């Protein structure tokens, strides 16, 4: 069977969870689903192969990186566990990212704690992507698509019995001497299930495949880095979850408490590093398989405490008493004063409360009606304690009592007629944002009159404090997806949608045009500084896509799939260079240097094509099954108002894999090919990168209760610049835009990691 059949899909939706309707087995039997290399859980979606998920656990500690296997999906470089996913050139908050049904939020001006950073790859059981045109039931407050990640469902024992099992794993990587482990345990009866999962990941700095800089100093006396070492790529992370679930007949109640402790994580493309991130997440869900369909309800709460400062590879002491701006190493000084600064602490606290209720109602035949409501209330405080020198004598309030409240409702009709499947939906959404008054380092009260302060802090604060900051956006989204199974060897799909996203708090309510402060508000990793505009309009994307899928009748020998797409975004949030002195758009653009930009709505267009193919080469009992697979994509993004290119668009890329499966063995050789990134954002002074090719090896052996794998990434230790890695600011005097001989200066992209040998083992008990 090549793909999920319609009756099986309905049965799976109604069963909702393993064993959910055990008391009525005659109506809800076990459903076994098989599919091809990109499993399709529903129309418009692509799912990561569970085997691929398992094979990534020793290779990466970054859940977002697991999605690189899908055509059209890439990742912005960030910290070692915090990459930002991108779908067809739209990334980060332009995507809806759900983790176990929760819309988690990054509480950081650099988005160092994005949603996928709260789940370890070792805890991921399933993951799927809805690119571009998404059904309204899974889309919302996004324009680029939806990513859905789930941990394993609760498990129950047969009636009258108990179940006790678990698994443990460990891995090591030569890159950064990274290592980690994971543990999971379950105890269950027929009605109750108790579970625990935990993981730990740690790494030192990684190295490139060659020297990429001509300096070794870090800004810290006595501490230097080799010219091939990528500064600020270290990390340490611990994630733990405790779960209790109860079922009775067709009803399931599931509660999970998760805790994350991330004591340090370096960021090579950000001027700050994460020095502490703790999060408590409470997730309570109900699922009922009822006579008329499925009812689901969920409430969750996320409480985040986040801290940043200059990490081990970046200058910590600033001010004249530390040696001044021209010193490559800041000397310790005291006392903290107008001439002596100890770091630049930045803190943010975020609270995120969500509620959702949705139902899938059976209609005639296999047709379904999905309806639902969602509420999300988010609160954010972001402030920077005084630390001396220019950060003195009071705290800097970046966002005060930021509020972003979402209210949404949707209806979606899924219709099946012979070889046709159609999903038509409408979604109504209202998003209210607001923030309180602010002040800079130069005063302890929010000013409403006056000027002054270094970097025009008082002037900018007055303009912000006297503005109308209470904004409400109400809009209607729609999507229509049609699939036609023309024959046993041809499938076609067409989709059209209008999707809307309200600006985030850091886009609307950051206020200071001062270069130093703006440098700290950046979640794209380009080394520039950004500040917001309270009058930003929501982004609206009108997208059209089509898919042609040709394959053999059995779906096991060959396939070719092409998906062209086009998106018009009339209110795309891009940026313009800003002159802080005159508080106007820059009359003369800054070229080949870092600069300050302000968010601005502008007309944009994105288009491209995703492609994939596979071919079964031969199958032998003695030699195994050999398969060749090709995936890739091409994307372009243009700012139609300025004729500039959009930032961080992945260039033409393709991955060619030759794999062998024999018994418990899976072996693969992978070629990764990326074209030159020549089309870059001039307003941001984005750096071009050259094309490259890499070779990776993987071997995995799996038995019922244990598995072991080894692999080599970048086999030939090839040097290359990561096209979405951003600007290298991983060491030196990163708080400022320094003059020679100081660093970091504009012109060095973050390089990719050199050769990395890894090994992992997993045991079940």
What are these regions (language model features)?
Residues 27-59, 84, 92:
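N-terminal periplasmic "start-of-domain" segments of outer-membrane beta-barrel proteins
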Residues 104-133:
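Short acidic/polar hinge/loop motifs at secondary-structure boundaries
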Residues 155, 163-169, 173, 177-277, ...:
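Periplasmic-side early beta-strands and strand-to-turn transitions of outer-membrane beta-barrels
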Residues 204, 209, 500-501, 575, ...:
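C-terminal beta-signal and adjacent terminal beta-strands/loops
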Residues 208-230, 309-345, 383-397, 433-470, ...:
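Solvent-exposed loop segments that connect transmembrane elements
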Residues 237, 250-295, 303-324, 331-334, ...:
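Flexible loop and strand-edge segments within Gram-negative outer membrane beta-barrel domains
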Residues 294-310, 485, 491-493, 497, ...:
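Membrane-embedded beta-barrel scaffold of Gram-negative outer-membrane proteins
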Residues 364-366, 416-420, 430-431, 557-573, ...:
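Gram-negative outer-membrane beta-barrel transporters
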């Amino acid at each position: 069977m090549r793909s999920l059949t319609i009756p099986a899909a309905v049965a799976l939706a109604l069963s909702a969870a393993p064993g959910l309707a055990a008391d009525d087995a005659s109506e809800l039997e076990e459903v076994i689903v098989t599919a091809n290399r990109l499993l399709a859980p529903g129309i418009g979606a692509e799912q990561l192969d569970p085997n691929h998920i398992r094979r990534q656990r020793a290779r990466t500690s970054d859940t977002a990186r697991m999605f690189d296997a899908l055509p059209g999906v890439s990742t912005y470089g960030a910290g070692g566990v915090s990459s930002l996913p991108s779908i067809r050139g739209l990334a980060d908050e332009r995507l809806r990212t759900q983790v176990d049904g929760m819309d988690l939020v990054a509480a950081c001006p650099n988005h160092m704690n994005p949603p996928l950073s709260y789940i370890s790859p070792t805890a991921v059981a399933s993951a799927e992507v809805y690119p571009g045109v998404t059904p309204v039931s899974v889309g919302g407050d996004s324009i680029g698509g939806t990513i859905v990640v789930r941990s394993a469902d609760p498990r129950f024992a047969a009636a009258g019995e108990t179940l006790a099992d678990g698994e443990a794993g460990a891995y090591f990587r030569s890159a950064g001497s990274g290592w980690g482990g994971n543990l999971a345990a379950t105890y269950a009866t027929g009605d109750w299930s108790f579970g625990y999962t935990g993981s730990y990941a740690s790494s030192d700095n990684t190295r490139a495949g060659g020297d990429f800089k001509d300096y070794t100093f870090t800004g810290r006396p006595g501490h230097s880095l080799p010219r091939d070492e990528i500064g600020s790529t270290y990390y340490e992370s611990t994630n733990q979850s405790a779960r209790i679930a109860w079922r009775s007949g067709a009803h399931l109640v599931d509660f999970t408490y998760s805790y994350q402790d991330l004591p340090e994580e370096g960021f090579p493309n950000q001027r700050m590093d994460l020095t502490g991130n703790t999060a408590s997440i409470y997730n309570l869900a109900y699922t009922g398989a009822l006579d008329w369909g499925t009812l689901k309800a969920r409430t969750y709460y996320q409480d985040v405490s986040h801290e940043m400062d200059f990490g081990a590879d970046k200058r910590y002491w600033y001010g004249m008493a530390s040696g001044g701006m021209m010193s490559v190493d800041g000397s310790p000084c005291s006392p903290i004063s107008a001439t002596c600064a100890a770091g630049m602490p930045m803190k943010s606290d975020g609270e995120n409360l969500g509620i959702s209720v949705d139902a899938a109602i059976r209609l005639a035949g296999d047709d379904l009606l999905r309806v639902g409501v969602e509420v999300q209330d988010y609160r954010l405080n972001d402030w920077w304690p005084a630390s001396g020198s220019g950060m003195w004598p009071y705290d800097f309030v970046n966002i005060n009592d930021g509020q972003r409240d979402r209210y949404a409702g949707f209806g979606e009709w899924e219709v099946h007629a012979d070889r046709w499947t159609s999903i038509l939906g409408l979604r109504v959404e209202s998003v209210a944002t607001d923030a309180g008054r602010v002040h800079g380092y130069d005063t302890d009260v929010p000013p409403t009159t006056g000027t002054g302060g270094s970097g025009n802090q008082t002037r900018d604060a007055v303009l912000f404090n006297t503005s109308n900051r209470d904004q409400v956006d109400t809009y209607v989204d729609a999507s229509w997806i049609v699939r036609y199974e023309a024959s046993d060897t041809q499938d076609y799909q067409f989709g059209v949608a209008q999707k809307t996203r309200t600006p985030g708090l850091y886009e609307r309510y950051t206020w200071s045009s001062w270069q130093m402060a703006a440098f700290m508000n950046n979640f794209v990793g380009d080394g520039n500084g950004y500040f917001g505009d309270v009058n930003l309009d929501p982004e609206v994307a009108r997208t059209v896509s089509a898919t042609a899928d040709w394959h053999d009748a059995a779906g096991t020998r060959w396939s070719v799939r092409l998906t062209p797409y086009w998106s018009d975004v009339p209110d795309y949030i891009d940026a313009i260079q800003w002159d802080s002195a005159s508080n106007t758009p820059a009359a003369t653009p800054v070229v080949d240097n870092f600069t300050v930009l302000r968010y601005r709505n502008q007309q944009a267009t994105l288009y491209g094509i995703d492609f994939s193919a596979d071919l079964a080469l031969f199958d032998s009992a003695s030699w195994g099954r050999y398969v060749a697979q090709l995936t890739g994509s091409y994307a372009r993004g243009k700012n139609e108002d300025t004729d500039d290119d959009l930032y961080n668009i992945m260039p033409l890329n393709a991955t060619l894999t030759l794999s062998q499966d024999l018994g418990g063995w899976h072996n693969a050789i992978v070629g990764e090919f990326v074209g030159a990134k020549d089309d870059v954002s001039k307003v941001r002074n984005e750096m071009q990168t050259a094309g490259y090719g890499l070779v990776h090896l993987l071997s995995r052996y799996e038995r019922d209760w244990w598995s072991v794998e080894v692999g080599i990434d970048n086999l030939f230790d090839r040097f290359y610049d990561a096209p979405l890695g951003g600007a290298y600011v991983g060491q030196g005097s990163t708080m400022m835009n320094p003059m020679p001989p100081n660093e970091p200066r504009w012109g060095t992209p973050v390089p990719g990691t050199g050769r990395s040998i890894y090994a992992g083992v997993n045991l079940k008990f």
